[in-house]
A protein has these predicted regions:
Chain B
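Cys-dependent protein tyrosine phosphatase-like superfamily
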Residues: 1-335, 351-574
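Hydrophobic anchor at the beta1->P-loop junction of P-loop NTPases
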Residues: 337-339
Length: 549, 574
């Protein structure tokens, strides 16, 4: 087996482990193909099982013959291992480095993982496009499910089934695909039941410098407009970035060719800028020696909060066009796989109460991120501590989760889930025993046989005990559109992720338990009162008033 | 009233942007002896806006336009009202009237002192007995064999800004007290503020010594030794000078300064670096400006927050409290706290430390007693700091605001530790400025006595206590870990946030979301009603009084702790 070649020293005794908020443990360090394990072999201490794929980078230090390895994880945790013996330390270090940067997907842990729990519902079948379409069909007959991408030939990053206007045939779709970046022709993202308006997404149109046009593309998107109505194109790039894209064959919808559409440009940053922000933000959060001035200026300089504000603002704009203006919307940036998805998925959180439930939110992530072709494998292969130069890495999904957290914080009673679900998705997007976030597109997931060979994260999440753990005790279904405040004063640093390992969670957990307690106690009383009421009602009907003395 | 030139103006437009209002309301403006009242014309809503004259902090008349003359009304609770008058004459009159009404020249003019003292006499007397510093000294088990009461200041002769009732070390003779008082700025000698029953260490307070570069006082040195002796567990005390070291050194040139470790053999000196009232006043103005920016970018906001320096100051106040609390609880060493005069930063540091050390001060009643003792009785100059009368604007400073904000910041870290919620802190702040009650009038106990406030007005505490249901934190439970014992906050800069509820309340989501506090409070209320119904029904079902005890026995015994005590609390006999 190849793993054995990489493991130079499989076990070392007398290793001391330091990790946040837990007592120091001394024990045996073992390396397996997928895990770094530290066990004291005593019952009362918790073992450490760390996936190699969760390791972002390591740092080695030596003091005499005592070596220290600082392991920096993708979930932003840092742990320290004190290893006696310089050679052991060097061996462990280089083994970890090799094992945490394996290139081959098929060597990844999800292919080896066997669930220790009973799978009630196979998560790979929980959110199929045909099921989602059934809900749409119940509301409108203006849309159909097209199989034009059945073998992933029209668009390599789309799923085999996409929803398109009923009166547009597959041939038109094929031609429109040729005119859009990555073949990503406009498809349905969201149908607003209240007024029948829709949100679509796509890649940028390939107008190039000489203003190419495509009648089929124009027909496709015009088919979504009601007679006499205008729609909005929300381009997530600034006008100048969009102009520059022309030189590389891209571009945007011009007024001349799309007279029924008004174009609005926003300024959501691209991947390498976002990655840079993440690195700076995490660095600032981990330096506890900062003065207040220095902390605030570092926070500002990271620009992270600026991205959060910009993304949320754009999502609000899209939602506003649909709900307030009663207009349909097409969203795209360049490829249509990053900022586009942030906007379309957040707009649905705002508009659609169903997306604020536990199941509904998973469905949203499945539809708007996984099926929609966000390249998770590329984007999440490195996190904030990686020393190598980023190529395709970007925390676009993490930013989306951050934005959801902001909305959740502003509407603490409108979400069925707590922050925990968001943190869990962040962790699993970067390192997981489940296959859900492997690969870059639906086509790749098929090619890698993920549904057959790995377990879905949703299989695990949707068990009663896990649902229970993720449920928000304050939840009261709210059927309204919810408009978050996007003023900087209203947007906070997401402590649950960025300060998670720097601040003890105990007091917040206590508060959560107390909330659960208050609500449970109320339910308990409610039940008692109801059963007593029933008893009384029975007594009254059974016993007519004849037993009066 | 003599100062009201025009009691009523019609067709006035009012706009309050800070409340998230976009379009002005049209209505009638009335001036009464106490309030500016605006009544909207709209026949269905007839919304009313009331502004106390004593809450007005500024009036401006920007150049008018074709639609009328403008008057901008700024309030001490940071509300801003834009008024538009059709006639310039009305605007001028209202401006002149309000200028006079909002700046009373003497306490006599204040509305709360113009009520007839003989109505509700019983209620008034009861209101003043609700919260007394003497109750707190009793609670701490004083006097005891270490700390004794002294009558040295019963006539305010030794120190006119101290209370009549003082607790001092048993080892300090009357001569030492007098001598120490003479060697301290404004006579504010070291006296007890808080006694920690677990470690027997104490927090004491005073003002700076009149040491200059080399001055000494044998009595004052004996006084400091006496403080040390009153703690059998340690052979030194910390002297916490809450000022920046440079400021303290500069004071030496004026014949004041700080204790030299050479002269006072048994002290360790610590500087906390809290800036003076002038720095704080302008810092608060800057954070207010940040909160009022219209559509700022994230960078504008964060840089504005940094440049205001406000959170840095809040951190400094909390850090001072943490230092004192650690010394008392962890090391068992007594602490003597002072700044310059010992009535601003010293009050902040002592009361923050007390809140960290003592769970009682995290209850509503406890916080009231703490403020009554550390602030009101020890001569925090409420009337000067919160601009009650027309006076020197350089005396105004948000000292109490900062203490209340520290509590808010702590509540963010310890959501279950405090019995009260954010509303309580905000309303308490407003009441410190608004002169609606006698408690916060004047600058010292002596002044308050000579004004006979207890005979002429009500206490602020009965007002707050009456509304206690509204101020209840539903997550508070007496037996939780963060409710017990010492609070150990994290004071890394990232733990501090802008207090949005005070500085930027207008930015809210739509529709306004229910807060967890409101939601849980209503659930809690529902539970109480259900408990009641359950008890009644069990009675009916059992055909007689049912054993009510089932709930306490099986259901949830801890619930009892969540009930607010009725009436005034424990010491009701007097």
């Amino acid at each position: 087996m190849e793993f054995a070649e990489l493991i130079k020293t499989p076990r070392v005794d007398g290793v001391v482990l330091h990790r946040p908020f837990m007592p120091t443990v001394e024990g045996t360090l073992c390396l397996t193909g997928h895990h770094l394990i530290l066990s004291s072999r005593q019952d009362n201490t918790e073992e450490l099982w760390l996936l190699h794929s969760n390791i972002d980078s390591i740092e080695k230090r030596f003091l005499g013959s005592l070596g220290t390895i600082i392991v920096k994880c993708k979930d932003l945790r840092m742990i320290q291992l004190d290893i006696p013996g310089m050679e052991e330390c060097l061996n462990i270090g280089s083994s970890i480095e090799a094992l945490s940067t394996l290139d081959s997907v098929s060597l990844m842990y999800p292919y080896f993982y066997r669930p220790m729990f009973e799978v009630i519902e196979d998560g790979w079948n929980s959110f199929l496009p045909e099921d989602a379409f059934k809900d749409l069909e119940a509301m409108t007959d203006e849309w159909r499910l097209s199989e034009v991408n059945r073998d992933f030939r029209v668009c390599t990053t789309y799923p085999p089934l996409v929803a398109v206007p009923r009166n547009v045939d597959d041939d038109t779709l094929r031609k429109a695909a040729g005119f859009r970046h990555g073949g990503r022709f406009p498809v349905l993202s969201y149908y607003h039941k209240k007024n029948g308006m829709v949100m679509m997404r796509s890649g940028q149109p390939l107008t190039g410098t000489n203003g190419r046009r495509c009648k089929e593309d124009e027909r496709l998107i015009n088919a979504t407009l009601r007679p006499g109505k205008r729609g909005y194109v929300i381009d997530t790039r600034t006008i100048s970035v969009a102009q520059q894209a022309k030189a590389r064959g891209g571009g945007f919808e011009t007024e001349a060719n799309y007279p029924q559409w008004r174009r609005i440009h926003k300024a959501i940053e691209r991947s390498n800028v976002l990655q840079d922000s993440l690195v700076k933000l995490v660095e600032a959060c981990n330096d506890q020696s900062h003065s207040m001035d220095r902390w605030l200026s570092k926070l500002e300089a990271s620009n992270w909060q600026t991205h959060v504000k910009e993304i949320l603002t754009t999502a609000c704009l899209a939602a506003q066009c649909i709900d307030r203006e009663g207009a349909s919307v097409l969203v795209h940036g360049t490829e249509g796989t990053d900022s586009t998805l942030q906007v379309t998925s957040l707009a649905q959180i705002i508009l659609d109460p169903a997306c604020r439930t536990i199941q509904g939110f998973q469905g949203l992530v499945e539809r708007e991120w996984l099926q929609a072709g966000h390249p998770f494998a590329q984007r999440c292969s490195m996190s904030a501590y990686s020393n190598s130069k980023p190529r395709h890495e970007a925390p676009g999904f993490l930013l989306f989760l951050d934005c959801v957290w902001q909305v959740l914080r502003q509407f603490p009673c409108s979400f069925q889930f707590t922050e925990q679900l968001l943190v869990l998705l962040f962790e699993h997007a970067y390192a997981s025993q489940f296959g859900t976030f492997l690969g870059n597109s639906a086509a790749e997931r098929v090619r890698l046989s993920l549904p057959e060979k790995t377990v879905s994260l949703w299989s695990w999440v949707n068990r009663p005990q896990e649902i229970d753990h993720l449920s928000n005790p304050l939840y009261e279904p709210n059927s309204l559109v919810i408009w978050p405040s996007v003023a900087p004063q209203s947007l906070l640093l997401w402590e649950g992720v960025f300060l998670r390992w720097n601040r003890s969670p105990r007091c917040q957990e206590e508060a959560h338990e107390e909330m659960v307690h208050i609500i449970e106690y109320n339910k308990e009383l409610q039940n008692k009162v109801n059963s007593l009421r029933r008893q009384l009602a029975q007594l009254e009907t059974q016993e007519p008033p004849l037993q009066t003395p | 009233m003599e100062h009201i030139r025009t009691p009523k103006v019609e067709q006035v437009r009012l706009l309050q942007r800070r409340a998230g209002q976009r379009k002005p309301l049209l209505g009638t403006l009335y001036l009464s002896a106490t309030h500016t009242i605006f009544v909207e014309n709209h026949p269905e809503t007839r919304r009313e806006t009331w502004v106390l004259h004593s809450m007005v902090s500024g009036l401006e008349r920007p150049p008018g336009g074709p639609t009328g003359s403008q008057l901008v009304l700024r309030c001490k609770d940071f509300r801003v009202f834009h008024l538009l008058f059709p006639l310039e004459r009305d605007c001028v009159d209202v401006h002149a009237s309000l200028t006079r009404l909002s700046r009373p020249e003497s306490y006599r003019e204040l509305y709360c002192l113009s009520i007839n003292p003989n109505t509700n006499q019983e209620e008034r007397e009861k209101s003043w007995s609700l919260v007394l510093p003497s109750q707190d000294y009793q609670r701490m088990g004083l006097p005891n064999n270490l700390w004794v009461a002294t009558a040295a200041n019963s006539e305010y002769k030794m120190c006119d800004s101290y209370p009549a009732q003082l607790f001092v070390s048993r080892w300090a003779s009357p001569a030492v007290l007098m001598g120490s008082s003479r060697f301290r700025s404004r006579g504010r000698l070291p006296v007890l503020s808080y006694f920690h029953q677990d470690t027997l260490a104490a927090v004491c307070r005073c003002s700076q010594p009149l040491s200059g570069f080399s001055g000494r006082s044998e009595e004052d040195e004996q006084m400091v030794t006496a403080v040390m002796k009153a703690n059998p567990g340690s052979d030194f005390i910390y002297v916490v000078d809450t000022r920046p070291r440079l400021n303290a050194m500069a004071n030496r040139a004026a014949g004041k300064g700080y204790e030299s470790e050479d002269h006072y053999g048994n002290i360790k000196l610590h500087f906390s670096g809290i800036d003076n009232i002038h720095v704080m006043r302008s810092s608060q103005q800057r954070i207010l400006d940040v909160g009022e920016q219209r559509t700022p970018s994230m960078s504008d906001f964060l840089l504005g927050l940094e440049n205001s320096g406000w959170l840095k100051h809040i951190k400094a106040v909390l850090d001072a409290g943490v230092f004192i609390a650690k010394a008392i609880a962890d090391e068992g060493v007594s602490v003597l706290v002072h700044c310059s005069d010992g009535w601003d930063r010293t009050a902040q540091a002592c009361s923050v430390a007390s809140v960290l050390l003592e769970p009682y001060y995290r209850t509503m009643k406890g916080l009231m007693v703490l403020i009554e003792k550390d602030w009101v009785s020890f001569g925090h100059k409420f009337s000067h700091r919160y601009g009650h009368l027309d006076g020197d604007p350089r005396e105004v400073s948000p000292v109490l605001d900062q203490f209340l904000e520290v509590l808010w910041q702590l509540a963010q870290q310890f959501p279950c530790a405090f019995q009260f919620n954010e509303r309580f802190l905000l309303d308490l702040r407003t009441l410190a400025y608004s002169c609606q009650d006698g408690t916060f009038l004047g600058n010292s106990e002596k002044e308050r006595r000579s004004l006979r406030l207890q005979e002429r007005s009500f206490s602020v505490w009965s007002r707050l206590w009456r509304d206690r249901e509204k101020y209840w934190n539903p997550l508070y439970r007496a037996e939780q870990s963060q409710t017990q014992g010492v609070l150990r906050p994290n004071t890394t800069p990232y733990c501090f946030k802008m207090w949005k509820g005070l500085y930027s309340p207008a930015e809210t989501p739509a529709p306004p979301a229910q807060t967890p506090v409101d939601f849980l409070s209503s659930v809690r209320e529902g539970s109480q009603q259900l408990e009641q119904e359950l008890a009644n029904q069990q009675e009916v079902a059992a055909g007689g009084p049912a054993p009510l005890g089932t709930r306490q026995a099986t259901g949830s015994p801890d619930r009892g702790a969540n009930q607010l005590p009725e009436g005034g609390g424990t010491q009701e006999e007097d």
